[in-house]
Amino acid sequence: MQREIHISTGADTHTLHSSGMPDPHVFQFYHRAMDILEAAGIDYAVGGAYALAVHTGIVRHTKDFDVFLKKESLPDALAAFEREGLRTHVTHPHWIAKAFSPDGELFVDLIYSSGNGICRVDDEWLASAVPGEVLGRPAPLCAAEEILWSKSFIQERERFDGADVAHLLLKRGEKLNWDRLLARFGGNALVLFSHLVLFRFIYPSEPSPAPPRVYDFLLEQFRSQPVSKEKVCRGTLLSWSQYLIDVEEWGYADPRLRPRGNFTADQIETWTRAEK
């Protein structure tokens, strides 16, 4: 069941599709992509820049359009786009595919997991989507909790989404379902804790976005975490590139590998080679 969302950010959906609006062919293609998915009966939620704009008021128009769906729905989604004459490509089999506009200039990202394999799109992700508008068209939007969860792990040299996380905490912190968010992070809750610490540094004049019990829980996690008996570097969950030396030369285990993670060695090698 979808829940209503009321956001006071100084930029509502009307502002989003009347100020800095992209070229008509851009949003026409995005509208068409959503029409195709809905006609095929595929559950999805819009994320990326357009969902972030609704949740925070930060407007960024990009040439890609992020649609989140379950991996089980991907074959039907690709087939639906191809029936409409759109070229598709499974960019990285473990988390993302694309559907391209006829001229190849625009594309839709079909996302069903995260690059690190942690943030998989599941029934809860789609059931928690909130009703909204994307460039004047009704559309389900990824909930703030899922956006924050997935963005918290993006800490590459060339892309760090910490500012997006801080802005989500600033604009949506009081309304977040913190129990659900903690459950999403699970054993990686210290990543959330690190962003809450950064928030306190970034916004010293703002109240804490999380209730005291959340800080108590995370502080206890921090204090009680024992030193791992296994020599492991969890940095690869934050950046595919910046911790390669740890797992390739310094003898640290890679937590992305099974059974600890979701990847085989071949999958990691393929992913790393493609990103390089």
Locate the predicted segments by residue:
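Catalytic cores of NTP-dependent nucleotidyl/adenyl transfer enzymes across multiple folds
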Residues: 4-9, 13, 120-276
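Anion (oxyanion) recognition and catalysis
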Residues: 38, 82, 133
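Short, flexible active-site-adjacent loop segments at beta-strand->alpha-helix junctions, enriched
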Residues: 50, 73, 114-116, 138, ...
